[in-house]
UniProtKB/Swiss-Prot annotation:
Catalysed reaction, written as an equation: Zn(2+)(out) + H(+)(out) = Zn(2+)(in) + H(+)(in)
Family matches, as SUPFAM superfamilies: CorA soluble domain-like, Magnesium transport protein CorA, transmembrane region
Primary location: membrane
Residue spans, topological domain Periplasmic: 295-300
Protein name (record): Zinc transport protein ZntB
Sequence similarity: Belongs to the CorA metal ion transporter (MIT) (TC 1.A.35) family.
InterPro entries cross-referenced by the UniProt entry: CorA_cytoplasmic_dom (IPR045861), CorA_TM1_TM2 (IPR045863), MgTranspt_CorA/ZnTranspt_ZntB (IPR002523), Zn_transp_ZntB (IPR023714)
Entry superkingdom: Bacteria
Amino acid sequence: MDAIKGSELQIPDAIFAWVLDGQGGVKPLADDDIIDKDKPCWLHLNYTHSDSADWLAATPLLPNNVRDALAGESTRPRVTRIGDGALITLRCINGSTDERPDQLVAMRLYMDERLIVSTRQRKVLALDDVLGDLKEGNGPTDGGSWLVEVCDALTDHASEFIEQLHDRIIDLEDDLLDQQVPPRGFLALLRKQLIVMRRYMAPQRDVYARLASERLPWMSDDQRRRMQDIAERLGRGLDEIDSCIARTAIMSDEIAQIMQESLARRTYTMSLMAMVFLPSTFLTGLFGVNLGGIPGNSWHLGFSLFCLMLVVVIGGVAWWLHRSKWL
């Protein structure tokens, strides 16, 4: 392939444009730089910015279908080989476990041995790890190692998020053992996060496995082995997600049972109270509607004696319920 001039990659509103120095570091792209396989260029764009969108639509450095894909709508993770290059769509975890599980942040990239063009709309936090290593001189040295490092960082963020969800499930299980029911919607949010993760991470694992098996000329055998390790690590995370989804289903049944038992206890308590006060209610009603006059109304101890009789009746009913083991 012919070398690319740095002036062809100068975009005013690019997020950044770096040239890998081949020793683990980077330097800003200059107009007189010559971009080749030994010193590839990483161009990171926000495809909603006007200059970046215009460059993507007009540059002859990218195939037509690649230009459309880099500025297109979000899709599930996938990889398409185009000659010696690859068009890749990946997903990154950006939020915390307290946030609603919006669609994971999408990053699209096209790369060959000379050029790496990545696009996004929202910030991809995992790229900060790779950028930090490059600025310290400990980063990738070529396109193949760059792709491995990016996929590794994405998997690290996904694994950390899955671990946080797993810890929350453990805490929730401990609370349920103590008969503590979580707030309404808590378990639904947790389950939704797991399902969204499963939806996007499963094809992303397949992307990693595909990259490990593709004989791309700018990836070495060692890099392909590392990519396979990353795919297997994400696969273990998916197994953990499946386990967590099953556990949330069990917890949902447990919460329903706890709520049903709580309602049954309240209903039972109200029934017992009705049984205790039913005789006294009957007596007071009977005395109150006596058309011939309330018995004992002319005796000064009549009301006191009636109250004492009610206490005896209530006590007798309570004793009978206790003896019958209803209380």
